[in-house]
């Protein structure tokens, strides 16, 4: 890819589990955007060198590889515990992948990967208001001594109550305001039945 002139800030690579230290340094130097898909990686590909990639100064975000059952909360947990087991235990380093680092990968890292880190990925003046609200008044979240750690370790997609995209509320109190969920489920079921009939 380097010889072809492809490595650069407009390249987004997924998984990144087979990279050598030289590859990591080169990709970081060229500004390549990288995404890890932890569940898919562990199921099929292997352990990514996430700590080394971050140490090299590369942009690293989280994805779910298109897997519908997954969500960003699951991906953060899987990567955290995989990194602790694979990279942390041998060196007796239980914080090889910290919760603030994972939250940044899930937010700013994803925005950077899309090439929109200047307008998305963090709550700052001048950036688009893309936010989710969590119900933290629940026994698996509260009380919390460190909310960032608790969100990464304990929160899940069911805790999301509201979603705001570019300042517009699209989900309020777990009700999607912009789509007909019942109709979508009905259509999905109908199409699935048609696919099954054709397959057998």
Regions found by a protein language model. Give the residues of each.
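Histidine/acidic residue-rich metal-binding segments in metalloenzymes
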Residues: 1-33, 45-60, 118
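His/Asp/Glu-enriched, well-ordered alpha-helical/loop segment
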Residues: 4-6, 10, 51-138, 154-155
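Residue-level signal for inorganic ion chemistry
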Residues: 13, 65, 167
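Flexible loop residues that form catalytic
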Residues: 16-17, 84, 137, 168
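Short, acidic/turn-prone active-site loops that include or flank metal/cofactor-
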Residues: 38-43, 65-68
């Amino acid at each position: 890819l380097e010889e072809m002139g492809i490595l650069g800030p407009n390249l987004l690579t997924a998984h990144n589990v087979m990279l050598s230290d030289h590859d990591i340094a080169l990709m970081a130097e060229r500004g390549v955007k990288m995404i890890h898909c932890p569940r898919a990686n562990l199921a099929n590909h292997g352990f990514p060198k996430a700590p080394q990639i971050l140490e090299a100064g590369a942009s690293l975000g989280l994805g779910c590889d298109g897997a519908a059952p997954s969500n960003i909360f699951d991906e953060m947990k899987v990567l955290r515990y995989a990194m602790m087991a694979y990279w942390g235990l041998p060196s007796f380093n239980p914080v090889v992948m910290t919760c603030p680092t994972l939250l940044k990968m899930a937010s700013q890292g994803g925005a950077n990967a899309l090439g929109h880190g200047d307008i998305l990925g963090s709550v700052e003046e001048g950036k688009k208001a893309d936010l989710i609200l969590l119900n933290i008044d629940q026994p698996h979240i509260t009380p919390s001594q460190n909310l960032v750690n608790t969100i990464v370790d304990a929160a899940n997609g069911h805790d999301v109550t509201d979603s705001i995209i570019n300042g517009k509320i699209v989900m309020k109190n777990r009700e999607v305001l912009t789509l007909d969920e019942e109709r979508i489920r009905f259509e999905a079921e109908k199409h699935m039945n048609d696919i099954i009939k054709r397959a057998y």
